Amino acid sequence: MKVKLFPIPARGSGTAEIESLPSYIHRAAHQHGIFVGELIRFAGRQVRRDSSYQGRLENTPTYLQNHEILRSNKLSDYLIDVFEHLTGQTLSGTYASVLSKAFTRSSHEIVHGFRWCPECIDEMLALGEEPYFKLSWHFRALSVCPIHRGELLQACDHCGCKQTSYRRIKPLNVCQDCGKPISYRKASGGSKNAIPTWMHTGRDVLQLVSDLQRYGYSSLPENGLVTSVSQLFDHYWRLDKEDKFYELLSRDKLLSVAHCGHSLCLNDARKLSFRLGISLYDLISGNAANTTPLLGID
């Protein structure tokens, strides 16, 4: 089949700067000169008529909220399949499927709507690049830009518009309501208003995004987090130091993972990896026992 949509690549592929799926869809709608809803409906009609499309078919809601398609679920998987098929581009890293596959569900890990760093948007424009919204900006854990140290915005500082309108008639760097640049910030993100580097509490999540782009989601084994915690438990058990093991996280949570095969929410996994001195990727890939400095396991 010939490509039915412009072959628009996702921005920042292979890096921690990867574009989010909602950003890609909004950007593609603007480049095609149609509203977001029209683009999604058109894409759905095309794959239904295309005998070469082997993916699953889904009925899309009238309106999609960003946080609903940033996890791995039937709807987000469907949109990825459809847009990859129609554009010939790879989009698998544009949503946070790791939240559904490696961690237990929590409604607080992804913010609603879009967020952005005005200084990053301004730099994209200065470099002649098309502005976009990064996947990492959707994580609640990351509230400050790690590059410019300014707080991420969730609404236009001119008029308060949140940029989620399906009437995508302007590029992503322009407010969809007032038409002014969203790269504007009332209080400068630099100098005295910059957030100290030690307050960048979301760096571990940013590193996870980077690691998943580098190694691929397919590199994560099934129940990798369970493997890590079980091996840690066995190590402390052999040394008769279970009390030290339970200092890493609550006893009930750790045993539910080691003995019952349950997972952890992202926030609990962050606490555990921090106390072990390892990355989130090592924890959920089953490598905690081999990388934890405190253990010295050969």
Each predicted region: which residue ranges?
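Basic, alpha-helical nucleic-acid-binding regions used in initiation and control of genome expression
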Residues: 1-298
